[in-house]
């Protein structure tokens, strides 16, 4: 099926299952704060990424960056650049672009109070906020880097520091992380805390955080 490179996908169900849980939890909190969120883009096909990267770049530049020549010839053109990478986390189904809207109007202002609140809430559930990047900040962009496209569990081998910090904070709040430091490093202490927490709930004891466990943790 042909890809409509000029159209963005907004369907949350196109995201990794773990990312879906995180986003849905965040959206509920955002709405609770009387903010109307607008999902701008979720999953992005690779060809659409080629199309976006081609904006403001020459064929030679695109090919030099790693774009197949056929796509570079098709999508390279003048104008303003709209993205800085060929390997967006959107392609991996682990990123979302999200902004507030008021009176039916999208707010593309990184200094807007509702934008700042959205960033705060998205970070509270484990997203990395593009707004905080020192190079080429991207305030609508939120991602979960370092996990596999089809990964169904956060584990010692499938996580990142943003997610791990949230898991540690929630385990500490639930009384299972003791005096350990919330450092974003998934080690033996995090494994043991997850196992003790799961045992207290009568669940199968392991050190994995799947969608059900993640949803439960984020409710604390």
Region locations from a protein language model:
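Short acidic, glycine/serine/threonine-rich helix-capping segments at coil-helix boundaries
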Residues: 132-136, 156-220
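Active-site acidic/histidine clusters and adjacent loop/turn architecture
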Residues: 2-41
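Extended, low-complexity, intrinsically disordered C-terminal regulatory tails
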Residues: 27-78
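Short aromatic/hydrophobic-glycine micro-motifs
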Residues: 35, 57, 126-130, 176, ...
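Short low-complexity, flexible loop/linker segments enriched in glycine and/or proline
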Residues: 52-56, 143-149, 196
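Catalytic cores and adjacent binding grooves of peptidoglycan-active enzymes
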Residues: 66, 73-154, 159, 166-169, ...
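Soluble non-cytosolic domains of exported or imported proteins
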Residues: 9, 13-21, 43-46, 109-116, ...
